[in-house]
Amino acid sequence: MSESEGGKDTTPEPSPANGAGPGPEWGLCPGPPAVEGESSGASGLGTPKRRNQHSKHKTVAVASAQRSPRALFCLTLANPLRRSCISIVEWKPFDILILLTIFANCVALGVYIPFPEDDSNTANHNLEQVEYVFLVIFTVETVLKIVAYGLVLHPSAYIRNGWNLLDFIIVVVGLFSVLLEQGPGRPGDAPHTGGKPGGFDVKALRAFRVLRPLRLVSGVPSLHIVLNSIMKALVPLLHIALLVLFVIIIYAIIGLELFLGRMHKTCYFLGSDMEAEEDPSPCASSGSGRACTLNQTECRGRWPGPNGGITNFDNFFFAMLTVFQCVTMEGWTDVLYWMQDAMGYELPWVYFVSLVIFGSFFVLNLVLGVLSGEFSKEREKAKARGDFQKQREKQQMEEDLRGYLDWITQAEELDMEDPSADDNLGSMAEEGRAGHRPQLAELTNRRRGRLRWFSHSTRSTHSTSSHASLPASDTGSMTETQGDEDEEEGALASCTRCLNKIMKTRVCRRLRRANRVLRARCRRAVKSNACYWAVLLLVFLNTLTIASEHHGQPVWLTQIQEYANKVLLCLFTVEMLLKLYGLGPSAYVSSFFNRFDCFVVCGGILETTLVEVGAMQPLGISVLRCVRLLRIFKVTRHWASLSNLVASLLNSMKSIASLLLLLFLFIIIFSLLGMQLFGGKFNFDQTHTKRSTFDTFPQALLTVFQILTGEDWNVVMYDGIMAYGGPFFPGMLVCIYFIILFICGNYILLNVFLAIAVDNLASGDAGTAKDKGGEKSNEKDLPQENEGLVPGVEKEEEEGARREGADMEEEEEEEEEEEEEEEEEGAGGVELLQEVVPKEKVVPIPEGSAFFCLSQTNPLRKGCHTLIHHHVFTNLILVFIILSSVSLAAEDPIRAHSFRNHILGYFDYAFTSIFTVEILLKMTVFGAFLHRGSFCRSWFNMLDLLVVSVSLISFGIHSSAISVVKILRVLRVLRPLRAINRAKGLKHVVQCVFVAIRTIGNIMIVTTLLQFMFACIGVQLFKGKFYTCTDEAKHTPQECKGSFLVYPDGDVSRPLVRERLWVNSDFNFDNVLSAMMALFTVSTFEGWPALLYKAIDAYAEDHGPIYNYRVEISVFFIVYIIIIAFFMMNIFVGFVIITFRAQGEQEYQNCELDKNQRQCVEYALKAQPLRRYIPKNPHQYRVWATVNSAAFEYLMFLLILLNTVALAMQHYEQTAPFNYAMDILNMVFTGLFTIEMVLKIIAFKPKHYFTDAWNTFDALIVVGSIVDIAVTEVNNGGHLGESSEDSSRISITFFRLFRVMRLVKLLSKGEGIRTLLWTFIKSFQALPYVALLIAMIFFIYAVIGMQMFGKVALQDGTQINRNNNFQTFPQAVLLLFRCATGEAWQEIMLASLPGNRCDPESDFGPGEEFTCGSNFAIAYFISFFMLCAFLIINLFVAVIMDNFDYLTRDWSILGPHHLDEFKRIWSEYDPGAKGRIKHLDVVALLRRIQPPLGFGKLCPHRVACKRLVAMNMPLNSDGTVTFNATLFALVRTSLKIKTEGNLEQANQELRIVIKKIWKRMKQKLLDEVIPPPDEEEVTVGKFYATFLIQDYFRKFRRRKEKGLLGNDAAPSTSSALQAGLRSLQDLGPEMRQALTCDTEEEEEEGQEGVEEEDEKDLETNKATMVSQPSARRGSGISVSLPVGDRLPDSLSFGPSDDDRGTPTSSQPSVPQAGSNTHRRGSGALIFTIPEEGNSQPKGTKGQNKQDEDEEVPDRLSYLDEQAGTPPCSVLLPPHRAQRYMDGHLVPRRRLLPPTPAGRKPSFTIQCLQRQGSCEDLPIPGTYHRGRNSGPNRAQGSWATPPQRGRLLYAPLLLVEEGAAGEGYLGRSSGPLRTFTCLHVPGTHSDPSHGKRGSADSLVEAVLISEGLGLFARDPRFVALAKQEIADACRLTLDEMDNAASDLLAQGTSSLYSDEESILSRFDEEDLGDEMACVHAL
């Protein structure tokens, strides 16, 4: 219920919903309304309840405010019908009723049993009648709501709400189905088979009614988080969905090309249509596929294909379905094996393995990345919201309390008139009036005190004491209650008196004391460590007794277990009673473990008594015995890290509970839908019953849950398709249901589990880290610190435990630190792998002698040292390691004595001797093991030594019979591990994995304990019950004898005889170990449905299964899967991911840039501009323009899409004309793409064409396609007689792929996809070492597998067969890859166990035929699965989540993936990749790049200029900026890297940081991106700041003028002057705001208006430039400066006659009185920057040449001949055509005055940022002044902020030499003053400034008072302002001076203090040139 944000007024208007206003009790005074059912006597305690009521009323009121005035065009709000509807709809019970109806409806749908063939029964018929009732209720609800809210037009109308719309559709569909049912029935229908009208199944639509429970979601806040994060993630998930779809489409089309029609041949008996095999698979009539080996069989076509013809590549849709199935990693190996049978081994494995790696490992892991990112974001938001809510509730309580107290006081005042009022009330009222209001806490405490009814004494004291202070109403209510209780109290009092007397006797006192002592002792005993360990020992014994149970155990063991159970139960009961007595009930109950103990003990007692009495079987509750095992978790008390983990698990339980609710709703909805679609339809195969069906509601739930876990979901889908008539049109649509269910359930919901786990662990991890820090710093405070964490009961022991834990942890940490010091600097995780691996440091010879005889200086030792560190030596050893590994893989596992093995044996001798020599050399250098730094002190060296010694020993023992030798031979496999020590990056990954394993330890313990507990429960439930007879008709071992007949496929003509055997299930629960094994396979989701159905059918020990005997037992498996597989395994995975992340972030800890900043800066430093070729030749240029045009791009895009469609149209058995058409189309497309290639080659010339990777790719495809056509034509022409398949084999398989590859070009088009691809490639760069580690693990396991299981015979029908075996190295690797994807790995494990048939070619002895395989298989496969599934695959996930965090990050944060765009667009401005562009183009460039990097198209030009002010890129002497500097400045400002504080200092710090991270960085590049302080030149930022200030001045001039010119002439000069000064004062804040670059608050003028005014400005005011004296003229290069508002093209900057005629003053700063010269801004300012080393006067010749190169359009020169201004060019931007297509506007350029020759221009700038401003981007810091500025000048002085609370941007100063002589660069005599109070300086006589009047002083004073002191110090500015005021007031300057003197004489001077002159000559000079950019005003 959301409270309305605002008002404190908690008394709403009465609304139709609550009906009542203030009740009668509150009649006396205004107050809170009475709520129904609440008595008038309620006190302040009622506030929370009442507050909720208020909030409800508020919402209702708000809602009514938003209601549509009319509903259905006729019902107004006053209409009684509508009012009654509204009150019904908003009545709470109505909501509850509807929800109950929804539940009832779900139940009805669930109870309904669908029958095959639309059959039915009475129950179903009755349920269909009930449907009508539901329909009526829902229809009524809908109608009422429509009447109440209106239908659709108003925003708050009924259908506008999503949930309502859903309801509406469901109701309409329901009514529609009823109408259809009433239609004429089909002949022959039974009267009660409803639901199938007109042949259309409306029940399927009815099932949508089941979506209604989703309305519950709005009631549970934690569900909101889950749903919100899923909803939020949908947008990035859509991107990924597109990528997945793209992968699927490409693979589907490749599949069509390669595998079209390959699945339709199988082995038939000669001359008949009978399939030769029971389980047929494809074959090949020729080539390298599977041949039919049985006699009388042949390979031929017309077989529908595997899975009834559903799995194939016969057309595009089948291909997509098959590819999707492979991407989900279910059943992909079957498809692969069928393809290998049909085609041979060359191509299929490449196709399928690459598909699984890309589609599953990479793309689908992105889903996880996105979800976990979104989830953590959402959780943070929710947390923030929660905190805010609590804060608000607290405020609300206080407010309510205040309201109540005021109201009580008022009531008392009214009561005062009543003489009979109690004295207490009077005093209370006084207290209230005196302001002694009780606080909320006080009131609640008193209330609590009064409720202690069991303590009479406390009550009496409270009743007396509280009367004085409680509010009157409270006291009233108390007296009432006391009145009621008086009678009882009489009796109570007498009892109490008796009791008191008895208690005071001596005996009782002694007893009490004894009791107290005994309790204290008990408490101490219970809390002692001895007791703790004793209990743990008991738990351990209990565990042992339970774990020792197994099937077929001897009688004595059973008896022992029974006795042990009873004894242990007694002991646990004693412990419980002792605790209860010692601690007291309340303290006992407060601990969670105690409550749990109590529950278990009571359960045990109950179970034992029931069994003894014989009331029940000794089974059901014996499960409770197993629950006792949970007591093991008591260990956590002494194990800090484990208890942290358990805490964080319990923490995530909360989030997971809400997720489970969502999951449950999801499963119910899909189960009901499944029942409607498939109920009773899975009976198409009569020969065997399907178990995963939708025939009843529980069964449907199980099936949906199975699909959710992804196990064999494809099999259920095949059944669904076959139920609807097989792989033809309508039946195939069924797959949509399964695909949606699988995607939503498995990918989204189950990944949210993992996301929650990762998120909670990450936050828990942070907590633990903090705790560790805390523990280290204040161990003394441990007791106090931990009091809050522990229940009061167990404080002392907890403290002890924690102290110990802390000490242990400290020791561990110290050890870790030592280890880390030994390792080379920091184990960087996944991230570091990208870094260039630095050269290994040469380890010096350690001190001490080697072999006791070679000293440190021994020449032999030195020589060896040089040798082993020589790079040739190390590389050679690496090569030998690789070669020896290859030789291992090449061995023949079957025939040990084959020729190949002999040769490899000799190689082995060679390698071993080389490695032995290496080790001896190293021992010579480092010594063996006695001293520090010696050879054997390193783990990796020990590994080397082990591997070599194993090889040496195995040479010594020759007899291969000894199993030791076999083991030693297997150990040679560890050789590749020696490479780890050689490759630095690999070492990092391995260290990372070890850290992960160490961290995972705790989780392993918790998971194993839980697994063990479930295994014990499983043993109790299922031991000995999984036995079956091979003949299903027999149920006991006694019956199961002899043989029986089998009819395959129900064919009576072919009976087979089989023997009856009594067999156990492969996975069973006969003992705890088997149970753990079985449960482990369940937790990997492999084969668990089979186990589940066995458990459901299990009946009793030594009795066969009974179909669906106990369906409820499935709860055991579901709970196990949720707790272990969903939750614990995901936490496991989450931990790995977090560990890798933490390892990766370690390297960012020491430097000041975070990961994202670092990546962006690295990109900016390393990026190079792209070259863009622009041809000179006009014809070539035309082609180039065409090829580069957008239209051409779109045309090619369209062609590729059409090509894709054409490729996708192929299908199996297509007609000859269709074939011909496809060939023609292929040629057409190839021709078109060839033309594209030729055009591009003409446009770019081959050299430039092939530099772009995409072009090279295109060329390859075109050439391949042409070859493809040629080969096809030749084949078809030459071999018409032959079968086309084999002749065109080469072309079909290989060259056809080129057609498909064109699709990949689409990827280069879309923006989002491009970014995804970019990140993919980044991930791949981060993966090489991870991939290397995976390859090593695969290699080692493959070689071990070959040695151990290579001899097992290949038998069809088993898991070790022709497609899946260990006989060759590639086969072994493929088999392991299959296990890594989890495809039935447990079956391969079973097939490798001992007792399997040996391969006939292997060398086994007589009688050893069935001895192949090994028990080692269990350890082998489980360890491999754990390593792969949990560690290795998660390395992928970790890397991907690392690189894709931008998908979920706030898009407005700049990331490295944004920066490619900059390169692309820069190349348009700098086609030659010179790395520099005109600084004017920077604005245009940045407006073309979208935020966050650029400004975006919508950014106004002037705002863009403002943002450039913050960029500190150096401006070169030719007016250009460089590529890296621009990109770096963008990154720096966007990510706020060192932008605060003093800029010089920040720059210095940043330079240090960059040097520290990128040690090999070139100094030149560093100086380019961060100019060093001593060379600071003009930067773009300063340049644009100059322009902005000048522009502001012009604007404010115009505004002021508008304001002042309207007035009539002032009556007196003095008052006119005062008005002028006042207006100047008004202007102050505006000026300050302008200077803070505050764009937001500026008043917006219409752009058109501004332009018109500009036009008028130029036409009416013939003002010219103020010329500088000729001494200032020098060589210069003109740089144009953009202005925000633009001029029409028609306006020329050319000089007019009037301009030429206007005389200009030789005095630069004092305007002529009365002249119009300085009235308004003229056309341009000149700002020239000298070219270095070029002092001759120069025009724009060089510039023009460069401009021509850049193809700059027209230019206008603006010459003022008389004034002698140097020529200056106004440049229009080269991209004008692109940028201003719509408007006829070009930016007006302003140019600044020239700088004298021979010196660099240098700005002095001070920028003071306004506080609290985030949107402004000021340039911080004090900038460097020119080289000539004095060393003693106080640089920081201007930084003193003005006292107005708002800082200002000081304008920029262009310091120049020239006419004013040395004055402008003179030394400052003292620090510059900021403004203080208003004071007028004395007259200042300065020869260079002519006469100054009193008016100047007044203007200065006003400026200073307004915080514009910096302007006041500039005499030219003051003169200008004075001139402005004079013009505005229509005074001459002399009149103005006189008026000023009069004002001062009249005593205004008392306002000013005359202490000292503000303008000293030096200050003035320093500030004088401020107007360099503004003096044209």
Swiss-Prot record:
Molecular function terms from GO: high voltage-gated calcium channel activity; metal ion binding; voltage-gated calcium channel activity
InterPro entries named in the record: CAC1F_C, GPHH_dom, Ion_trans_dom, VDCC_a1su_IQ, VDCC_alpha-1_subunit, VDCC_L_a1su, VDCCAlpha1, Volt_channel_dom_sf
Main localization of the protein described in the UniProt heading: membrane
Bias type Polar residues, positions: 1661-1670, 1702-1716, 1733-1743, 1829-1840
Ranges where the record places region Binding to the beta subunit: 395-412
Ranges annotated as biased composition (Low complexity): 455-469
Positions annotated as IV repeat: 1177-1444
Keyword vocabulary terms for this entry: Calcium, Calcium channel, Calcium transport, Cone-rod dystrophy, Congenital stationary night blindness, Disease variant, Disulfide bond, Glycoprotein, Ion channel, Ion transport, Membrane, Metal-binding, Phosphoprotein, Repeat, Sensory transduction, Transmembrane, Transmembrane helix, Transport, Vision, Voltage-gated channel
Compositional bias (Basic residues): 48-59
SUPFAM superfamilies, per database record: Voltage-gated potassium channels
This protein's GO CC annotations: membrane; perikaryon; photoreceptor outer segment; voltage-gated calcium channel complex
Residue stretches of each II repeat: 515-761
Coiled coil location: none
Domain writeup: Each of the four internal repeats contains five hydrophobic transmembrane segments (S1, S2, S3, S5, S6) and one positively charged transmembrane segment (S4). S4 segments probably represent the voltage-sensor and are characterized by a series of positively charged amino acids at every third position.
Family in the record: Belongs to the calcium channel alpha-1 subunit (TC 1.A.1.11) family. CACNA1F subfamily.
Protein name: Voltage-dependent L-type calcium channel subunit alpha-1F
Organism: Homo sapiens (Human)
Organism classification: Eukaryota, Metazoa, Chordata, Craniata, Vertebrata
